[in-house]
Amino acid sequence: MYAWGDHRRFNSYSGYFRRTFGGRVQKISVDAGFSCPNRDGKIGEGGCTFCNNGAFTPSYCIPAKSIGRQIAEGIEFHGRRYRAASRYLVYFQSFSNTYAPLERLRALYGEALAYPGVAGIVIGTRPDCVDAEKLDYLAEIARDRYVAVEFGIESTCDETCLLYTSDA
């Protein structure tokens, strides 16, 4: 038996959540209407060649809907397809979900965390869209709630990154 209480040689994410939260945890994607510096003209326009959010965004994720409504529809959506979850992680997935002023992030993340059954948040973003102030805020949330930050690092080679941009 390994230190994480399993006979597997790896500590699975789902196993970690079951041990931490006492049951199945489901990620619920939301679209908060964020953009990206490679889409809005700050760095580039049109986005990167690999970034096709339509390919993975569930139909209920519409930025015009409130975060709460998207969570409710996401719970219903996943409830029809999978075993019932005991807790939820709200997944800010589309584009760069820290690419906004801190007050906007506080409002959006706060709405998600206030929803019943939400154990935490998962935030997809770019390393260049996170500063010390935002990290301090996420650390503040993480004192009481689960927080994961997914940094989209498509390559560590600058030449390759230049090829990824659709306007390069």
Language-model-detected regions and their locations in the chain:
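Conserved small/polar residues in nucleotide/adenosyl-binding loops
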Residues: Y164-A168
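Short, solvent-exposed loop/turn segments at secondary-structure boundaries
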Residues: K42, I62-P63, L102-E103, L162-L163
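Conserved SAM/AdoMet-binding glycine-rich loop
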Residues: Y82-T160
